[in-house]
């Protein structure tokens, strides 16, 4: 009979936990530091819905979600290496031309059906022509809300500066400025505007969905380091993201509950927003060259950049379309 030495037994006992640790390490989720350019966005609640539906777990990803007070602040975090992947505005692609080490990797949301220009309920402003020369609050300079305000002014024939743009960050700060008489209105999530209407505090005078038919309201960006050193993790993230979009299209009730928590409005409002906006979400992240041209040319037209960047310098098409 074969004799088993004490050394063999001890060695096996020591090796077993090492094998287990090795397997656990292999199965450990990849952490992604994920940022939203603003916190209370129905479109950006996709990340939270993916968490609630355990889609990130299925993709072996631990998503560490943070939110900022606008595109410019998120771009600072991307530059500082504090964020791996972010969701921000289409015009925010222009930050690449300013030296931010991040680039668009997937289209996310088409024309801005999710944004409104809101005034106080008591405001004398009733229609768009009343906005000439008025002070409109946006999140940050160079952000989507800035871009939309300047584009609206330009379309009205007033030039890009026919409406005064004031960057005041998050909605509470802008609403307070309106109540003090320091602002005449603000560009915000339509859902938040509906909530202010129900509270008797505000009034949406327009939605921005028709301002540009070929356009990206929101895009997904990734840092150069993420693209170069963790491309497969990025691919898994994008697969999880668009799996979540597919789930959202098929499960309105589930989406409404999570969306209401994230956007911090009533479920009845999120239900209304869902019906109006779900069709604007990209299903695979593929880029529309016409929309890219609209954005890059507008960056100079509206004074956000002093030149028109080359298309390929602001987006990367190697990761899309995404198959789920």
Give, region by region, the residue ranges found by the protein language model:
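Secretory targeting signals
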Residues: 1-4
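Conserved C-terminal helix/tail region of periplasmic/extracytoplasmic solute-binding proteins
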Residues: 300-324
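Short, glycine-/small- and polar/acidic-enriched structural segments
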Residues: 28-158, 165-170, 174-180, 184-190, ...
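N-terminal export signals
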Residues: 8-28
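Phosphate-coordinating loops and pocket residues in cytosolic domains that bind phosphorylated ligands
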Residues: 11, 107, 133, 198, ...
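Secondary-structure end/capping motifs
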Residues: 228-306
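Generic structural marker for isolated residues within well-ordered, non-membrane alpha-helices
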Residues: 52, 149, 193, 256, ...
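Pocket-lining segment of extracytoplasmic ligand-binding domains
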Residues: 91, 172-261
